[in-house]
Amino acid sequence: MHKPNITMACVVHCKGKFLFVEEMEYGKRTLNQPAGHLEKDETVLAGAARELLEETGIRAEMQKLVKIYQWHAPQSQTDYIRFLFAVEL
């Protein structure tokens, strides 16, 4: 049985600007949305709020589900299902 990884991400908007986090991915610096993996016994809403807090120090509730999509990371040959939420600060 195929089991893709479940991830959550947040599009954070505040005063006309969007928030990104800086990460290293395959040896290159990249900008990304605050995001991460779902933990055991966690809802996707709670997981998204936790990741936002861990990566930015911002405590906020997810306000809108923007999109659910599946993608394949070619370097790691890993499949993901991502829940993308919006947060307005």
Regions found by a protein language model. Name each.
Residues M1, E39-T43, S76:
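Residues at secondary-structure transition points
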Residues M1-L19:
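Conserved N-terminal beta-strand and adjoining loop/helix that marks the start
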Residues N5, H13, Q33, L45, ...:
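Short connector loops at helix/strand junctions that flank enzyme active sites
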Residues M8, Q33, K40, W71-A73:
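Generic structural "secondary-structure junction" signal
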Residues M8-C10, L65, F83-V87:
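A structural signal for short, well-ordered beta-strand segments
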Residues C14-E54:
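Conserved Nudix-box catalytic region and its N-terminal flanking loop in Nudix hydrolases
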Residues R59-K67:
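A short coil-to-beta-strand element that immediately follows conserved catalytic motifs
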Residues W71-L89:
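Active-site-adjacent beta-strand/loop module that shapes the phosphate/pyrophosphate-binding cleft
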